[in-house]
Amino acid sequence: MCIRDSAVHSLFGLLLWQSKQLVRGELWMALATVGHQVEEQMLVMLQWHTAASHQDATDTWYGGRHIAQWLDPRLSAALPKTWSGYDVDGAWEALVATLDLFSVAARQVADTGRFHYPADDERQLREWLSERQPERTEPRRSDTP
């Protein structure tokens, strides 16, 4: 298993753990502790995506600095949805948006021949999440007048 395989499985495991905390009502742990680890894995994949997408040496800085300058604009547009406020509905939406964005970036890196993307594992994770994600309890902020 290469480091990229490990990164994908680590992110999948973290999202599974985060979802379990949300199911148990442990919002603080889900967002603060696990959420930080999820963000770190996401950043690594976004950096790899940038490196795989550019022939020239693109500087991805560190810690996400200047991310708007080096990240693919299509991925950058999806990034805000991966963050939530302190609410369960928003946390679930951000979790799924994180998986969506990570999946796009990781699949594109995998397509360059750098590793095999575990599509079956992603499908199983998505099924697990969809079975446990509650119906929205409040309207989205954008849904209110």
Model-derived features with residue positions:
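Conserved nucleotidyltransferase catalytic core and NTase-mimicking acidic/glycine-rich helix/loop elements
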Residues: 4-145
